[in-house]
C-alpha cells in the first residue's frame, strides 16, 4: 500500500525487488502538501524506516530506501515546515526543513554558497513572539556566534544570502597616456 499525501494512494502490485522509491513513483509521487523528507515504511503495523528523498536527490544516498515486502505500507506524511532560501546560493528555492535543521544545513540543501556570496551578511526574516516580522543578520564565519546559537529555523522563515560588495576601496585609477 502507498497512502498519505500521494497523488494516487492505494494498493499496488510491485516486483519483489521494489523499494520505497519505486512505490512512491508508481503512486504518482507526493502531493503539493506531501513530504519529501518524512516517508515512512510500516511493516506489520510497526515503523521500520524513514526515507528522506532530499538525501537521494542531493547526495545520491539510497541507504534508507528499503526493499519492500508483502503487506508493507509506505506512508507519505504532510510537510511540516518550509523555508525560502535565495540570493547567492546554488539552488534557490523553498525547502522542507526538519526540526533539527539550522541555517547551515538549510544552505547546504540549497547547494551551498556561490562564489559571490558574502557569508558575513546573511539575512533571516522570521516571525517573533508577537507575530511581527523580524530580520536577523547572521555572520556564518563568526565562531562565537556558531557556538552560542546554531540559528535554528522556523516554518515560514526566509533566508537571503547577500552578495559581496561591488564597491572597491583603496583603488587608484590611472588614466591618460601612461
Predicted regions and their residues:
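Ser/Thr/Pro/Gly-biased, low-complexity, turn-/loop-rich segments
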Residues: 1-178
